[in-house]
A protein has these predicted regions:
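Key DNA-contact positions within bacterial/archaeal DNA-binding proteins
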Residues: 3
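Generic recognition of stable, solvent-exposed alpha-helical segments in well-folded globular domains
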Residues: 58, 81, 128, 147-150
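Class I SAM-dependent methyltransferase SAM/SAH-binding core
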Residues: 118-120, 130-164
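Class I SAM-dependent methyltransferase "Motif I" SAM/SAH-binding loop
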Residues: 123-127
Length: 164
């Protein structure tokens, strides 16, 4: 509802969390706020971390039972917001660092990938890192592995969208 959104934004502006321009009657975020809260590709994007926290709260009863019984809690037993949040949280860091910083820091790895290597991404989740590497190193072959079938389905769909 537009009225509720305006009231909420007005409260945020009164608290100094957003800016209000009375001339245009618009609200805005600072560049830094937008970088962290609204630009999904930014390396500082934090809403994925919020999804992870929400999933942890949803799992409190399961975690308590796991601690009481010693039976553990499988990755697959978590709320789906954990899997989506994990991908949203880590993907920007992978995009910003994996190809440009981390791989070059590993002696000889970049040259092998450029020449054509076979790579297994174990625990690939939604496939963000696998896709980033496959796009950067087309001479190499990348296969993602994960025991969580719904995550593998998301990874396959993402790979198909990028035509990998």
């Amino acid at each position: 509802d537009a009225r509720y959104v305006r009231e909420w934004l007005s409260a945020q502006a009164a608290s100094g969390y957003v800016q209000y321009d009375p001339a245009s009657e618009t609200f805005s975020l600072s560049e830094e706020q937008a970088f962290a809260l609204a630009q999904e590709g930014s390396p500082a994007f934090i809403p994925g971390a919020v999804q992870i926290a929400v999933a942890q709260f949803k799992a409190i009863a399961k975690m308590a039972a796991a601690m009481r019984t010693g039976l553990g809690l499988g990755w697959h037993e978590h709320d789906s917001s954990l899997f989506h949040g994990t991908e949203r949280f880590f993907r920007p860091g992978y995009a910003a660092n994996l190809v440009g910083q981390w791989i070059p820091a590993l002696e000889g790895v970049q040259a092998r990938l450029e020449a054509g290597a076979r790579v297994a991404d174990v625990g690939c989740g939604h496939g963000a890192s696998t896709i980033i590497m496959a796009q950067a190193f087309p001479a190499s072959s990348f296969v993602g592995f994960d025991y969580h079938a719904p995550s593998v389905e998301v990874a396959r769909a993402s790979a198909a969208k990028t035509r990998l």
